[in-house]
Amino acid sequence: MSKQSLSYKDAGVDINAGNALVEKIKADVKRTTRPEVIGGLGGFGALCAIPTKYKEPILVSGTDGVGTKLRLAIDLNRHDSIGIDLVAMCVNDLVVQGAEPLFFLDYYATGKLDVDVAASVIKGIANGCEQSGCALVGGETAEMPGMYHAGDYDLAGFCVGVVEKSDIIDGSKVRVGDVLIALGSSGPHSNGYSLIRKVIEVAGINPAEEQLAGKPLADQVLAPTKIYVKSILQLIKHADVHAICHLTGGGFWENIPRVLPKNVKAVIDESSWEWQPVFKWLQEKGNIDTHEMYRTFNCGVGMIIALPQEDVDTALGLLKQTGEKAWVIGQIEHATDGEEQVIIR
């Protein structure tokens, strides 16, 4: 009896589908290229030179995912913007240290590769890279039968940027009297989604059908994370920025102290802005304590920037010119030993 000849495809891995995906995304990837990138897709490793304008360049790296926002996107069959979220979570972490993102790589894993879904996701990644001036230089598409439920996939991103050593922003310059400027968020960004999904479950609603402030709730919870790279890089050329905080997991209470030296505190004026409807809806439907809201969500604030009083008007003007919603949200005050470093009142 002759034995059946098995192939990789029989085992659930379709190499032709992977090749079709590469062809489908080539044009999107090409649009993200930078002059420092050497070669194109397909090499074993991606090559990138450091821009010549840097005298003492320091590389800054970051990696992230999008949490369970991905679960919501998959359940709602909305794959076009989750890639933007992936890039945003990485490049926003880099720019808070003054770094210009150089290149990005992604990891896409699934049980059975759906070329159209994967292409939609990677198109979003390319979009995010364009928004941040970052080259998409490669990635890994892993088709792994038996590892994921049908239709599911997972994402991770990795980014490298560069900053002049003398221009690193690390919070060490923060002083009592510094003013805090907020940059508005586009929504929950990519944090707090396990709680968002729980609220939706408890409320018993379909986010695609539920209307909130004239738009489907799905549009509001899946709004792509705002990318602040270009506006912040422009700002730090013209203002003496002492610290920048990216409000991600842990919200106000955990992220702001990461950029503060000892013996100072950030005093936030919560009357300086109004929460977007999606945050009010979440608090009401989930009966969520305000302290928990500030710990879980950005509540409408994507970034907080600390700078001297004399730079405030210049900073606000520049940020608004670059399309940001920016306002004074608080100030830096002296803190005694053991005192909380974030006060919201």
UniProtKB/Swiss-Prot annotation:
One Gene Ontology term of the molecular function aspect: phosphoribosylamine-glycine ligase activity
UniProt subcellular location: Cytoplasm
InterPro entries: PurM-like_C_dom, PurM-like_C_sf, PurM-like_N, PurM-like_N_sf, PurM_cligase
Keyword Ligase: yes
Pathway membership: Purine metabolism; IMP biosynthesis via de novo pathway; 5-amino-1-(5-phospho-D-ribosyl)imidazole from N(2)-formyl-N(1)-(5-phospho-D-ribosyl)glycinamide: step 2/2
A Pfam family recorded for this sequence: AIRS
Any one Gene Ontology BP term: 'de novo' IMP biosynthetic process
Catalytic activity: 2-formamido-N(1)-(5-O-phospho-beta-D-ribosyl)acetamidine + ATP = 5-amino-1-(5-phospho-beta-D-ribosyl)imidazole + ADP + phosphate + H(+)
Keywords per UniProt: ATP-binding, Cytoplasm, Ligase, Nucleotide-binding, Purine biosynthesis
Enzyme Commission identifier(s): 6.3.3.1
GO cellular component: cytosol
Keyword ATP-binding in annotation: yes
Matching HAMAP family: AIRS
Family recorded in the similarity comment: Belongs to the AIR synthase family.
Protein name, UniProt field: Phosphoribosylformylglycinamidine cyclo-ligase
Naturally occurring in which organism (per UniProt): Pasteurella multocida (strain Pm70)
